[in-house]
């Protein structure tokens, strides 16, 4: 035990502790030039974890949070943020430790902070002493690398199924089509596109899955017939609403609507 502790102290002397056993570092911006860091990114260095974060257009993402989860010691993760070139580097030469690396990016948009998970190019664990390169991409949509849902957000609705014009027939969620028109750039600064999709039912209810975070004007129809719409439990019904996303969990966001004939 004494030997292991001594090795840990020697290896991690350049890190600081943040809240208990969590250790933090900073992106290596002082020892080498940007060109030198770029030239070295493609080669694995023993005892070093490094990589780069870019967005879907290939632009560097500064300020992304990279976490190397120490699978040997509880609550002793290594944490670093990316520099202006989207690059990061930290020592991973921890005795007998294996790490799995994840990342998030937090951005303010329309007055709210959103934290979104990054897509790893390689999510296999690695031995800290061996070192590794772990790059990430910030994607607004697409299936998650772990298969647990999507990177995009949810647009959910509650449909009043009773139709006063046809009391003997109940409206079906799956027959609803939503149209989302972006009201400006998306959260990553890219231009959004008009989304027109038929509803599907997910674990959180009927609606649209995997929608890029932005602010949208939303309309709804049922088999071609326009529906009245409002933000759930808010305001009067109308022909359209303009809405942004609210948090469902730490990294999952949603818009909730109410629809009626």
Specify the residue positions occupied by each region the protein language model found:
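Sec-dependent bacterial lipoprotein signal peptides
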Residues: 1-13
């Amino acid at each position: 035990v004494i030997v292991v502790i001594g090795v840990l102290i020697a290896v991690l002397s350049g890190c600081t502790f943040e809240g208990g056993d969590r250790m933090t570092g900073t992106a290596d911006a002082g020892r080498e030039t940007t060109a030198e860091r770029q030239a070295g990114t493609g080669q694995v260095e023993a005892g070093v974890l490094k990589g780069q974060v870019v967005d879907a257009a290939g632009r560097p993402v500064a300020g992304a949070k990279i976490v190397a989860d120490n699978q040997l010691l509880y609550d002793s993760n290594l944490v670093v943020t990316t520099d202006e070139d989207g690059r990061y580097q930290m020592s991973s030469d921890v005795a007998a430790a294996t790490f799995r690396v994840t990342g998030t990016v937090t951005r303010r948009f329309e007055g709210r902070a959103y934290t979104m998970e990054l897509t790893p190019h390689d999510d296999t664990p690695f031995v800290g002493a061996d070192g590794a390169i772990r790059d990430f991409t910030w994607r607004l949509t697409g299936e998650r690398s772990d298969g647990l849902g999507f990177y995009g957000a949810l647009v959910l609705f509650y449909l009043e199924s009773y139709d006063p014009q046809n009391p003997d027939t109940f409206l079906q969620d799956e027959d609803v089509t939503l149209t989302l028109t972006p009201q400006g750039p998306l959260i990553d600064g890219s231009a959004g596109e008009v989304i027109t999709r038929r509803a599907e039912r997910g674990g959180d209810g009927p609606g649209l899955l995997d929608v890029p975070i932005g602010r949208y004007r939303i309309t709804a129809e049922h088999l071609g017939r326009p529906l009245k719409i409002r933000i759930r439990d808010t305001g009067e019904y109308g022909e359209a609403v303009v809405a942004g996303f609210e948090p469902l969990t730490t990294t999952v966001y949603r818009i909730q609507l109410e629809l009626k004939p």
